[in-house]
Amino acid sequence: MNKCAIILAAGQGTRIKSKLPKVLHKACGKEMVNHVIDAMRNAEIDDVNVIIGKGAELVKERTTSKNVSYSLQAEQLGTGHAVKCAKDFLEGKTGVVAIFTGDAPLIKAETVKNLVDTHINEKNSATLLTSVIENPTGYGRIVRNGESVEKIVEHKDCNEQEIKIQEVNAGMYCFDIESLLTSLEQLSNDNAQGEYYLTDVIEILKKDNKKVGAMITDFEETLGVNSRAELAKVESIMRNRINRTHLDNGVTIIDPLNTYIEPEVVIGKDTIIYPGNVIEGKTVIGEDCILYPNSRINNSTIGNGVEIQSSVILDSKIGDETTVGPFAYVRPESNIGEHVRIGDFVEIKKSTIGNNTKVSHLTYIGDAEVGERCNFGCGTVVVNYDGKKKHKTIIGDDSFIGCNTNLVSPVEVKDNTYIAAGSTITKEVPEGSLAIARAKQQNIEGWVERKKLK
């Protein structure tokens, strides 16, 4: 059966008090609406339409990589009106449509799939996603007749029996497309708000003797975000969910409450993560690593057995058994080999570092290719920028760079070379050479006494 989805994402969200449309606020590094789109895709629904309104162009810009279509709701006149705006998307289609809100990022793909499967298997015209909660105050109650849903009653309209019902409407649905389109034509805005409500479609379907069902899910999954406090709550639940998955997969997270891991991160078993670490984007971390406190790793690949201490690694690759930090900065497009030492206050930018090389402290390497088994003394600087352009430096295998050396790019240091401490290298250093580029030391005897500095 054909399946499609509509995501309601047109509202500004005034209570969140932001210039940014509400659905573009991020939960664990990803826009809320993109969490929902991904849930649809992972539930095997590829045909997704996003209802846009406030900040429409920005929402399109932030979701364009998701390959979705859009319908414009120029005026926000209720959820029913939002779906009416997707009429062109729905017309000509057969099968079922799932309708979800773009501000509920905790929804799981398996829940979406189960809702659609339940709808199809029970041959319903509409199937509601519902939850059972202890305190349903403020929520629309689900009134059932056996397994079938009779109606949704808003809290303020409940009678004595209905007020006791704990099953509530989550505001997420699956509809038979033909039945939905027919019902939308009958929707009225004859109410105090002058809006069209999607919940009224249920009443219309029941009057037409159509079958309406419901599927209960965990209330946490259905939480919507209307304020910064609710966003923080949702993100806390999501972080806990992510961390629990890694724990269950054999990763040690010493303090999950103080560890931030985004949803697309992959971590190998027997890796240990100390508090204060931030792991973002599509980072992949191997097995048997140790992440000591307070590092940030973004969109990077970390090999097996790597140790990282209080450092920042961005868009780079770190090889097996390498150590990084403390206080190292590995900038984008760097490729660090295996068994490498990147020590304290070392900055690597857009460079390749060969296996078994040591860059132990207070060094800057930018736009360079460094061979294997090299050693960098303290205070080495690759001078890669002339004020207009960046230039490349090449350092061969088995080279020894003495302390306080300046390598002025573009320059090449061949294999098996030594550079004396304090040198400023501006020309090629031949293989097997010792390069010395510094002023000759001169001692002036009696100078201090003559100047009466003592």
From Swiss-Prot:
Keyword terms, alphabetized: Acyltransferase, Cell shape, Cell wall biogenesis/degradation, Cytoplasm, Magnesium, Metal-binding, Multifunctional enzyme, Nucleotidyltransferase, Peptidoglycan synthesis, Repeat, Transferase
Region (Pyrophosphorylase): 1-228
GO cellular component: cytoplasm; membrane
Reaction(s) catalysed (UniProt annotation): alpha-D-glucosamine 1-phosphate + acetyl-CoA = N-acetyl-alpha-D-glucosamine 1-phosphate + CoA + H(+); N-acetyl-alpha-D-glucosamine 1-phosphate + UTP + H(+) = UDP-N-acetyl-alpha-D-glucosamine + diphosphate
Top-level EC class as recorded in UniProt: transferase
Cofactor requirement: Mg(2+)
Binding annotation for Mg(2+): 103, 226
Pathway involvement of the protein, from the record: Nucleotide-sugar biosynthesis; UDP-N-acetyl-alpha-D-glucosamine biosynthesis; N-acetyl-alpha-D-glucosamine 1-phosphate from alpha-D-glucosamine 6-phosphate (route II): step 2/2; Nucleotide-sugar biosynthesis; UDP-N-acetyl-alpha-D-glucosamine biosynthesis; UDP-N-acetyl-alpha-D-glucosamine from N-acetyl-alpha-D-glucosamine 1-phosphate: step 1/1; Bacterial outer membrane biogenesis; LPS lipid A biosynthesis
Pfam families attached to this UniProt entry: Hexapep, NTP_transferase
GO molecular function, one term: magnesium ion binding
Binding-site residues for UDP-N-acetyl-alpha-D-glucosamine, renumbered to this chain: 8-11, 22, 73, 78-79, 140, 154, 169, 226, 331, 349, 364, 375
Coiled-coil region list: none
Residues of the active site: 361
GO biological process: cell morphogenesis; cell wall organization; lipid A biosynthetic process; peptidoglycan biosynthetic process; regulation of cell shape; UDP-N-acetylglucosamine biosynthetic process
Cofactor note: Binds 1 Mg(2+) ion per subunit.
SUPFAM superfamilies listed in its UniProt record: Nucleotide-diphospho-sugar transferases (SSF53448), Trimeric LpxA-like enzymes (SSF51161)
InterPro entries xref list: Bifunctional_GlmU, GlmU-like, GlmU_C_LbH, Hexapep, NTP_transferase_dom, Nucleotide-diphossugar_trans, Trimer_LpxA-like_sf
Subunit structure: Homotrimer.
Protein name in the entry: Bifunctional protein GlmU
Organism: Clostridium perfringens (strain SM101 / Type A)
Highest classification ranks of the organism: Bacteria, Bacillati, Bacillota, Clostridia, Eubacteriales
